[in-house]
């Protein structure tokens, strides 16, 4: 019996139709997942269990992260890779309206998505076979690394860099300003430094002491031991230039426990000193901020018209000055190495 060759020609047509049916089914399934939270959770749990992965909902801000919401927010913007490329992570974060401040929230959500949803996205959103997931995962890692380097470069501003900012208020010595660096919003103070101020700076510092600097951190018993040994070595070699030995660690190790107790006690006393001074320092800083805010409010109410006129001219103006920030904690070396 002869066979009509046309019988063989319907196979690719049927295969193509089958592919279309599968694609259409997966597309409908994704829409169902987006609309139906219960279906989403059921499928996500089954997906992880079938892959022998631990199914544990991340905790963010003290609450369980809504993975369904996260999946919808990311895929509605084209998937995780596109969100990172288009720098839209903040949009996703803002959609959650976290009541508490989440440290490095972009990293936390991205990590949660990678662990719980990225492979799920690959299968149900992009409708791609799991056999190709490793390629997408590798590409995303390179993108994240590139994005991190780009953000780092964009935020490393050198002294003298011109930035655009907004003047929020005015006080006796300068302005309260805000600016945006990358995706981060910053607030600070812009000071007028007159020649008289510069000349009197040294004198003022001697009269005020180091009240504007944070106190030195608590020293350890080992710190006290090294300081004592350095003094002893310099005294024994008076008149000679002697560098401190680098084997203080061995000397400390060879001390008996009873000998170390002397230095531990000094460290405890220094801890009391630090706690007292840090409280005083914080109180001083809070008072200074309150004074600046009060002066700003008073100046604004006294000369509202003048301030509004100046602000309208200077808002969004490019400045070539450096903003003053709170003093960073300074730790001085106890011993010259």
UniProtKB/Swiss-Prot annotation:
Keywords: DNA-binding, Nucleus, Transcription, Transcription regulation
Any one GO MF annotation of this record: DNA binding
All copies of domain ARID, residue ranges: 34-125
Principal location: nucleus
Biased amino acid composition, Low complexity: 319-329
Assigned GO CC terms: nucleus
A Pfam cross-reference name: ARID
Stretches for region Disordered: 197-221, 298-337
Location relative to the cell: Nucleus
DNA-binding stretch(es), residue numbering of this chain: 215-282
Listed InterPro entries: ARID_dom (IPR001606), ARID_dom_sf (IPR036431), ARID_HMGB9-like (IPR045303), HMG_box_dom (IPR009071), HMG_box_dom_sf (IPR036910)
Protein purpose: Binds preferentially DNA with A/T-rich content.
Family: Belongs to the HMGB family.
Protein name: Putative high mobility group B protein 11
Organismal lineage: Eukaryota, Viridiplantae, Streptophyta, Embryophyta, Tracheophyta
């Amino acid at each position: 019996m002869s066979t009509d060759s046309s019988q063989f020609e319907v196979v690719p047509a049927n295969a193509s139709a089958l592919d279309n049916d599968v694609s259409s089914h997966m597309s409908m399934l994704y829409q169902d997942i987006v609309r139906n939270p219960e279906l989403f959770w059921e499928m996500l749990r089954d997906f992880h269990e079938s892959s022998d992965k631990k199914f544990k909902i991340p905790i963010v801000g003290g609450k369980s992260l809504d993975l369904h919401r996260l999946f919808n927010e990311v895929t509605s913007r084209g998937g995780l890779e596109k969100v990172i490329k288009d720098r839209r992570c903040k949009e996703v974060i803002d959609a959650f309206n976290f009541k508490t401040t989440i440290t490095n929230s972009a990293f936390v959500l991205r990590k949660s998505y990678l662990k719980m949803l990225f492979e799920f996205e690959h299968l149900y959103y992009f409708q791609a076979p799991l056999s190709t997931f490793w390629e997408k995962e590798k590409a995303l890692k390179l993108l994240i690394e590139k994005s991190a380097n780009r953000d780092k470069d964009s935020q490393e501003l050198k002294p003298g860099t011109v930035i655009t900012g907004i003047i929020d208020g005015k006080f006796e010595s300068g302005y309260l300003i805000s600016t945006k660096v990358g995706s981060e919003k910053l607030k600070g103070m812009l000071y007028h430094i007159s020649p008289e101020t510069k000349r009197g700076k040294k004198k003022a510092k001697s009269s005020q002491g180091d009240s504007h600097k944070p106190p030195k951190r608590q020293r350890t018993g080992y710190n006290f031991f090294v300081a004592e040994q350095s003094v002893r070595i310099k005294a024994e070699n008076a008149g000679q230039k002697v560098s401190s030995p680098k084997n203080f660690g061995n000397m400390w190790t060879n001390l008996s426990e009873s000998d170390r107790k002397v230095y531990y006690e000094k460290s405890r006393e220094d801890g009391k000193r630090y706690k007292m001074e840090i409280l005083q320092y914080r109180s001083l800083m809070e008072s200074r901020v309150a004074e600046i805010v009060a002066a700003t409010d008073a100046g604004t109410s006294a000369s509202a018209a003048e301030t509004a006129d100046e602000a309208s001219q200077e808002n969004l103006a490019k400045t070539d000055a450096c903003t003053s920030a709170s003093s960073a904690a300074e730790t001085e070396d106890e011993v010259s190495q």
